[in-house]
A protein has these predicted regions:
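The feature captures the beta-strand-to-loop junction immediately N-terminal to the Walker
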Residues: 37-39
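Short coil-to-helix segment of the ABC ATPase nucleotide-binding domain corresponding to the Q-loop/switch region
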Residues: 89-96
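Hydrophobic anchor residue at the start of the ABC signature
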Residues: 143, 147, 157
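Conserved ABC ATPase signature
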Residues: 129-137
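ABC ATPase C-loop
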Residues: 122, 126, 147-150
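Conserved ABC transporter NBD signature motif
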Residues: 59-72
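Conserved ABC ATPase "signature" region
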Residues: 96, 100, 107-125, 180
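Helix-to-loop junction immediately C-terminal to a conserved catalytic motif
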Residues: 52
C-alpha cells in the first residue's frame, strides 16, 4: 500500500456549479518529494484540504498510511502559503504553538522548538518578533513550526506555495535552502507551486494537474535534477518548455489566468 492513496475521488465545492476532481486516482510513496503544478483553480490546494480534513464531502476513498483523513487527523504537517505567525509572540513561542496541545512539559516544548529553529538557521532569533524578520526568515520560522509537527508521528509534510510572496532573489535562495531541508526528512513531502523551475528543482516527481475536472494526474520523474545547474541541460530545458506549453494550453482552453 502506498503512503498516500486517492481512489476514484470526486469533489467539487458546494458554491460552484462544476466538479474540480472526478474519479481521480493517484498515489504517493513513503519519502517521495512531489511538487504539484497546474493552472490556478485546478485543485492543487484542494488536494491538501482533502488530506487534512478541511474538506470532508467527497466520493471515493482517500488513505494516508492506511487510514482515512479523519482517522489520520494530525498526520500531515502543513505549511500554508502565508506564514501566519502570531505578531504578539516571539519566534520561540510561535514555533512551540503546535506542541501546546500535546502531552509534554514546557521544557520539552522549548527544547524541540529550539532544535527546529537551529535546523532552519535562525539560532539567536528566538526572542525576536515576526515584524523584526525579513520575508525569507519568516518563512524559515514557518518551516520550523512545520518541522515540530512532523516530529510527532506525522509522516506527511504539505507545503502550499511557501515562497510565492517572496521577491525573486529571496525565492531562489529559499529554494536552494529548502532542497537541503526536505531531502533529509523521513517523510513524504508534497509541495504546491506555480513555478515550473521550482517544481523541477525541489521534487523528485512532478504531479501535473490539468483539465476541469481533473480526471488524472500526469507523473513526471525529475529525480535526475539534483542541483540548479541541472535545470539548463538540453533535456531539462525541453521538459520546462513542455510544461510551460501545457500551462498555456490550459489557459487558452479555460480562458482565464494561470
Amino acid at each position: 500500500m502506498s503512503f498516500v492513496e486517492f481512489n476514484n475521488v470526486t469533489f467539487g465545492y458546494k458554491e460552484d456549479d462544476y466538479l474540480l476532481l472526478e474519479d481521480l486516482t493517484f498515489s504517493a510513496e513513503k519519502n517521495d518529494i512531489i511538487t504539484v503544478i497546474g493552472a490556478s483553480g485546478c485543485g492543487k490546494s484542494t488536494l491538501f484540504r482533502l488530506m487534512t480534513c478541511l474538506e470532508t464531502e467527497y466520493k471515493g476513498s482517500i488513505t494516508i498510511n492506511g487510514k482515512t483523513p479523519k482517522e489520520a487527523t494530525g498526520t500531515a504537517a502543513f505549511m500554508p502559503q502565508k506564514d501566519l505567525l502570531m505578531p504578539w509572540r516571539n519566534i520561540l513561542k510561535n514555533v512551540t504553538l503546535p506542541l501546546e496541545a500535546l502531552p509534554m512539559s514546557k521544557a520539552e516544548r522549548i527544547s524541540q522548538a529550539k532544535e527546529a529553529i537551529e535546523k532552519v538557521g535562525l539560532s539567536g532569533c528566538e526572542n525576536k518578533r515576526p515584524s523584526e524578520l525579513s520575508g525569507g526568515m519568516r518563512q524559515r520560522v514557518s518551516f520550523a513550526r512545520t518541522l515540530v509537527q512532523l516530529w510527532h508521528g506525522r509522516g506527511l509534510m504539505l507545503l502550499d506555495e511557501p515562497f510565492s510572496a517572496l521577491d525573486s532573489l529571496t525565492r531562489i535562495s529559499m529554494q536552494d535552502w529548502l532542497i537541503g531541508q526536505v531531502k533529509g526528512l523521513d517523510a513524504t513531502v508534497m509541495m504546491v507551486t506555480h513555478d515550473v523551475e521550482e517544481a523541477m528543482l525541489v521534487g523528485n516527481k512532478i504531479f501535473l494537474l490539468s483539465g476541469r475536472p481533473v480526471k488524472q494526474i500526469k507523473v513526471i520523474d525529475v529525480s535526475h535534477i539534483t542541483c540548479r545547474e541541472d535545470l539548463y541541460t538540453p533535456s531539462s530545458v525541453e521538459l520546462k518548455n513542455e510544461l510551460v506549453r501545457a500551462f498555456l494550453t490550459e489557459k487558452a482552453e479555460r480562458g482565464d489566468n494561470i
